[in-house]
A protein has these predicted regions:
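Short helix/strand-capping hinge loops at secondary-structure junctions
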Residues: 100-102, 106-108
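Rossmann-like dinucleotide-binding domain that binds NAD(P)(H)
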Residues: 172-266
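C-terminal helix-rich "cap/oligomerization" subdomain common to oxidoreductases
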Residues: 79-81, 330-418
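NAD(P)-dinucleotide binding in Rossmann-like oxidoreductases
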Residues: 243-329
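N-terminal glycine-/serine-/threonine-rich beta1-alpha1-beta2 phosphate-ribose binding loop
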Residues: 1-99, 117, 121-125, 351, ...
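A contiguous active-site-proximal alpha/beta segment in oxidoreductase catalytic domains
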Residues: 110-173, 182, 192
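Redox-cofactor binding/interface segments in oxidoreductases and associated redox assembly factors
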Residues: 81-82, 105, 162
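A short helix->loop->beta-strand "cap" motif at the edges of active sites that frequently abuts
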Residues: 99-101, 126-128, 245-248
Length: 418
C-alpha cells in the first residue's frame, strides 16, 4: 500500500480490517484471503501510527519509509495499491508493472496520455491488471443515474454543470504538503470528468467523441497570486455525438472555501437531457444535526454517513460502510480469478475478460486523462501569462493541441489519437 493518507484511512483501511482475517468468496476460486503485506510512505511516520492502532488487526504488515524507488520488498507482493498525491502515481505504477505486479491506482490514474500509454503497454506486455479507482461511480445516486441512462429512460444528455467545494482546511492543512504547483481541478473535478465520460458515453451506447477542453482559474490564497498553485478552477468539456450534435459540461472546483460551511464538502450537479433533468445536491439528501460546541467545525451539520463515518453495528462492532469499498475487494477477487480461476493455458482469455471492464481498466481512462492533461496545459499557460487557452481534440494537428489567443503557434500536447 503506497500512500497512507485520508484515502487510505477512509477506503482501503476498512477493507483490510475486514479481509485480513476473514476471507471473501469468489465463485470461480473459492475463499480469498487479501492480506496487507507492506506499508509505503515517504517518512514511515504515518505507517507507525497505523501499526500502533491497527497493527494486530492488519496482520502486522511491514512499514517502509521510502521517498524514491525502489520499493522495499516488492518481489514479495502480488499487487501494489497507489493512493499517493497524483503527481507520484506514474513512477510507482511503472515500478510495480515492471516487476510484474498488478496495480490499482487512485484517481486520476496519471497526468498525461504519454504516461497512460506507457503503463498500458507495460501491463499488456507483463500480463498484469492495471486499474484506476473512481469511487464516485459507486455512489448510490450515481449508480441510479447510470441505470436510467443505460436503460434509455433519460436520453441524450445535452449540457450540465457540477460544483465541488472543499474547505480551506483541506488545502492549508491536510494537503498542504503536496498542493504546491497543483490545482483542485485535477484532484477534485476528475470525479465528475470520469462520471460524465463513463455514464453518458460508454454506458449509453452513444459513442460520442471528446472535442474541446477549456479552463481558467484563480490564485492567491493557497499560493501566490502570480504562482502555479490554484485556489479554484473552472473547467469546460465538450463532446460531439455521431450525428453532429454537441454536449457541454462546466465543472467548477475550489479548495479554499470557509471551514465553517455546513458539510464536509459541497457538491451540486445538474444534467440536462433531451427528455429529462437530473438535479443532485450532496448535503441536501441526508441528515442535519447540531451539537453545542461541536458543529459545524468538529462535526458537520450535514454529516456524510454513507461514506466516511464510523458506525456502531447492533452487535457492537464498529465499521465503515463507505461506498466504493467493493472496488478494492473486486480487484483482489479478480486477481484470484486471473491466477487461479482455471487452467494456466486459459489465463490470457481470463485477462482479456477482465481488461474489458471500461469503468476501471486503464484502457478506459483515455478521455479522463486527456481532459486532465488539457486542463493542466491550459493552466500552465495561464500561469505563464497566456490565459484563455482551449485544447482541441483529435484535429489535424494532433490528438491534443493547445490554442492560445493571439498566438498563431499551436502547441501539441499529445500527437497520437486520444
Amino acid at each position: 500500500m503506497a500512500g497512507l493518507g485520508m484515502i487510505f484511512e477512509e477506503t482501503y483501511l476498512p477493507v483490510f480490517l475486514s479481509t485480513t482475517n476473514t476471507p471473501f468468496w469468489v465463485p470461480q476460486v473459492g475463499p480469498v484471503h487479501a492480506r496487507l503485506k507492506s506499508l509505503y510512505s515517504r517518512t514511515g511516520i504515518r505507517g507507525k501510527e497505523i501499526l500502533s492502532k491497527h497493527g494486530q488487526k492488519l496482520g502486522n504488515p511491514e512499514n517502509h519509509g521510502c521517498s524514491s524507488p525502489p520499493l522495499p520488498g516488492l518481489d514479495q507482493l502480488h499487487a501494489v495499491l497507489i493512493a499517493t498525491p497524483d503527481d507520484r502515481h506514474f513512477h510507482l505504477a511503472k515500478e510495480a508493472l515492471l516487476a510484474r505486479k498488478h496495480v490499482l491506482i487512485e484517481k486520476p490514474s496519471v497526468l498525461s496520455l504519454q504516461e497512460l500509454d506507457e503503463l498500458e503497454a507495460l501491463a499488456r506486455k507483463n500480463g498484469c491488471l492495471a486499474r484506476v479507482v473512481y469511487h464516485k461511480l459507486l455512489d448510490p445516486d450515481h449508480k441510479r443515474l447510470r441505470t436510467l441512462v443505460h436503460d434509455g429512460i433519460m436520453r441524450s444528455v445535452r449540457s450540465g454543470y457540477a460544483t465541488l467545494l472543499e474547505p480551506k482546511q483541506i488545502s492549508t492543512k491536510q494537503f498542504s504538503e503536496w498542493i504546491h504547483g497543483r490545482n483542485p481541478g485535477t484532484y477534485v473535478a476528475v470525479h465528475y470528468i470520469k462520471l460524465i465520460d463513463f455514464t453518458f458515453g460508454a454506458s449509453s451506447g452513444s459513442k460520442w467523441a471528446l472535442k474541446r477542453v477549456g479552463a481558467t482559474g484563480q490564485r492567491g490564497i493557497a499560493g501566490p497570486a502570480n504562482g502555479k498553485t490554484w485556489d479554484s478552477v473552472q473547467l469546460r468539456v465538450e463532446y460531439a455525438y455521431p450525428d453532429g450534435r454537441e454536449a457541454a459540461f462546466d465543472i467548477h472546483t475550489s479548495w479554499v472555501n470557509p471551514d465553517c460551511f455546513p458539510g464536509y464538502v459541497d457538491q451540486e450537479v445538474q444534467f440536462r437531457f433531451e427528455n429529462a433533468i437530473w438535479l443532485a445536491h450532496q448535503r441536501k439528501r441526508g441528515v442535519e444535526l447540531s451539537i453545542e460546541g461541536m458543529t459545524p467545525l468538529l462535526i458537520k451539520e450535514t454529516p456524510n454517513h454513507h461514506y466516511n463515518s464510523e458506525l456502531l453495528d447492533p452487535w457492537n462492532q464498529r465499521s465503515r460502510q463507505g461506498y466504493g469499498l467493493e472496488v478494492i475487494r473486486r480487484f483482489f477477487g479478480d486477481i484470484a480469478f486471473l491466477n487461479h480461476g482455471g487452467h494456466d493455458s486459459e489465463r490470457d482469455a481470463r485477462l482479456t475478460i477482465l481488461r474489458s471492464q471500461e469503468w476501471c481498466d486503464l484502457s478506459g481512462d483515455r478521455n479522463t486523462v486527456a481532459i486532465v492533461q488539457a486542463m493542466e496545459g491550459i493552466l500552465q499557460a495561464h500561469a505563464n501569462g497566456s490565459p484563455g487557452g482551449v485544447v482541441t481534440v483529435n484535429g489535424k494537428a494532433g490528438g491534443l493541441v493547445l490554442c492560445l489567443p493571439g498566438d498563431p503557434v499551436r502547441k501539441v500536447l499529445y500527437n497520437g489519437k486520444v
